[in-house]
């Protein structure tokens, strides 16, 4: 899980979602998981 000020899709499988008011990126590749913070 990467914590970043700006989250972006890294590949075409990445999905930007909102969970509990946080913007997150989920992907089949665990290295692409990101959270805004």
UniProtKB/Swiss-Prot annotation:
Disulfide bonds: none
Database matches in InterPro entries: Ribosomal_bL36, Ribosomal_bL36_sp
SUPFAM superfamilies named among the record's database cross-references: Ribosomal protein L36
Family from the record: Belongs to the bacterial ribosomal protein bL36 family.
GO BP, one annotated term: translation
CC annotations in GO: cytoplasm; ribonucleoprotein complex; ribosome
Keywords of the record: Ribonucleoprotein, Ribosomal protein
Name of the protein this chain belongs to: Large ribosomal subunit protein bL36
Residue stretches in coiled coil: none
Presence of the UniProt keyword Metal-binding in the record: no
Organism the protein comes from: Trichodesmium erythraeum (strain IMS101)
Tagged with keyword Ribosomal protein: yes
GO MF entries: structural constituent of ribosome
């Amino acid at each position: 899980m990467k914590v970043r000020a700006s989250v972006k899709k890294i590949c075409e499988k990445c999905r930007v979602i909102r969970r509990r008011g946080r913007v997150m990126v989920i992907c089949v590749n665990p290295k692409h998981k990101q959270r805004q913070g």
